[in-house]
């Protein structure tokens, strides 16, 4: 089952629980990748809540959203850098991404092998990828009130296995969302305490697995997908050559009333 992009948007930006979840994940992300100065940063799935912090300092930031989910113009009011794509064929040149965030993607993938093959293809030498999936042992994967309760959850071992099969080397594990996935205000007031204690108490299980991985060179050499020479769509050519394109010019502050404030 694929969630609609507006449903996920509303969760993260228009609900108290979603805003708390966004803050928890971003806090972890800031400690994992505190600086992306001069780097090409790519997000796939619904990654825009976690990309904004990188807009000002990164060389380029692009958000890819799968066709099954839909797409939103983002960021508002700046020039759009989000693109609707086929999850099996990304319009990005091979090896030109330095940091990759996969969020709300693997658990909804129609072909996880093809998706991870594309992730491997676009990641450059020395690049890092962060895979975020619902924890099958956590409470969040069992709640229908959040996007984390949709799709297929993973255990850490299952995620590691998939990544190794597709040329990634799992390196660091992180967890987030120790708070209860409840919309009740009397329970939400305990969220900051639970998030703080969750990092210290091993018996508490986070609702989100965050796994940082690097790329093992040439592990899938000979793959027809990896070996194919594609040209990215015109809106993304600047990602490969560092030349700004009007659609993805993050320095363009021109406002548009049609864009959603996210």
Tell where the protein language model's regions lie, with residue ranges.
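Hydrophobic beta-strand segment of the Class I
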Residues: 100-101
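A short glycine-rich, Lys/Arg-flanked "PGG" loop and its adjoining helix->strand segment in the class I
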Residues: 113-128
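Conserved catalytic loop of SAM-dependent methyltransferase domains
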Residues: 171-196, 204-206
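Short alpha-helix
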Residues: 149-173, 177
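Short, glycine-/aromatic-enriched active-site segment of Class I SAM-dependent methyltransferases
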Residues: 134-150
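Class I SAM-dependent methyltransferase Rossmann-like catalytic core
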Residues: 1-35
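C-terminal lobe and adjacent flexible extensions of AdoMet/dcAdoMet transferase-like proteins
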Residues: 195-262
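Class I SAM-dependent methyltransferase SAM/SAH-binding core
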Residues: 27, 32-90
